[in-house]
């Protein structure tokens, strides 16, 4: 059920050689390999840091950072509950976590995208803008999510919430791209979505023979944590960045001394995301059984120890949403979430039910996905809310509301299902069906293991890599409140190619997407002179 980190765009692996070498400016990544430098080397440590920060040339900045809303437009109080349309708790739990992501919500409420969008139909950003605006501006009510949000994904059965979450994030990311123009990989990583959720890994390999160093950079949108041997999120992060020795059969082929030699490899976060999505790998690759252990996670998380540069002071993130799975395997269960409203109060969002909660209850859950935001970002948004005009606060009757699906007032305008353009659903389904999307993840997956032995590229330039589905198993209906499916939008007849893809998918899903000890494939080198 759990999937590994997403990588949108290519990776960059920078190679520094003492002699001039030809380069490919359109490479999906670049590699830096350098020998140990003398004390007065013209390429100082500071120079190398600046070089790494640039990573790769950007042909077009799709979403300049100044375009992000600087002030909060979110209501301070909690918004609406979401109606379960039949096995859609995974959709509702994911949508609530995105709705209460401050930078994303503020951008949606600014309506900036819809004013300039040229797609009009089939745009996930426009669809999410309508949903987030409606959810936040209708506190005390229950609304029905638009079918277009799950078009091409929902098939009438329980699906993986994290998988749907990243499916939605990817669709929003695609909506940021100009559909009529070719965009290079580096520019794709400048979109609004990548600015909010994205950062870069750095994998550094040091040859123990000549002391040459190779740095590889790879974009991420979420971070998957192995919790089998970890009792806390901090321990899982420590294991992730723990140095690894490469020797024997796994010895490193050094590009500096041109021989196989023992080496050390370290994976760290080179740049930090505004919003951090941590996925706890709770489900077995083979059986799908759940690792139902308690893994501690803090309200405030310092990510500085896991960064490439650890001497720049604390990098504190605060928890604002938790996605929870209740059940014993990926075959069954129920999803719900906890979110922190702008006012600072925590709420449990369980489909139509919205109830006040406490931080003690939030931190005691067997979390599946954790959402953190940089403390400075949260404080900036909170301060702007306190200075601005706030909507009415929820009364006690609203806070304690437990609206059941069978008790919905169908005549309330907020509860009416929006008019759904059939062409919108049809187009969204055609553009990205679940099976086709999963197949692309398997065929074009990238890993943070960085196989430095290969530098040739194999990914087509028009393929967008995000993440794979590990499990074929769908979650059966075990939630008593779930109705029969109303969102089965995948009944369209697949093409011959899609049928072939679906058949191939079964043999691919069981493979782990990331394994720290394995090597990375499909690289193209951008060689830079010292």
Swiss-Prot record:
Gene: USP17L18
Keywords, alphabetical: Endoplasmic reticulum, Hydrolase, Nucleus, Protease, Thiol protease, Ubl conjugation pathway
Annotated EC: 3.4.19.12
Active site, UniProt feature: 89 (nucleophile), 334 (proton acceptor)
A Gene Ontology BP annotation from the UniProt entry: regulation of apoptotic process
InterPro entries (UniProt xref): HABP4_PAIRBP1-bd, Papain-like_cys_pep_sf, Peptidase_C19, Peptidase_C19_UCH, USP_CS, USP_dom
Main location: nucleus
PANTHER family hit by this protein: INACTIVE UBIQUITIN CARBOXYL-TERMINAL HYDROLASE 17-LIKE PROTEIN 4-RELATED, UBIQUITIN CARBOXYL-TERMINAL HYDROLASE
GO molecular function, one term: cysteine-type deubiquitinase activity
Protein's name in the database: Ubiquitin carboxyl-terminal hydrolase 17-like protein 18
Biased composition (Basic residues): 510-524
Top EC class, one word: hydrolase
Biological role: Deubiquitinating enzyme that removes conjugated ubiquitin from specific proteins to regulate different cellular processes that may include cell proliferation, progression through the cell cycle, apoptosis, cell migration, and the cellular response to viral infection.
Subcellular location: Nucleus; Endoplasmic reticulum
Location of region: Disordered: 382-414, 509-530
SUPFAM superfamilies: Cysteine proteinases
USP domain ranges (all copies): 80-375
Biased composition (Basic and acidic residues): 382-392, 398-413
A GO cellular component annotation in the UniProt record: endoplasmic reticulum
The reaction(s) this protein catalyses: Thiol-dependent hydrolysis of ester, thioester, amide, peptide and isopeptide bonds formed by the C-terminal Gly of ubiquitin (a 76-residue protein attached to proteins as an intracellular targeting signal)
A Pfam family: HABP4_PAI-RBP1
Record family assignment: Belongs to the peptidase C19 family. USP17 subfamily.
Organism from which the protein derives: Homo sapiens
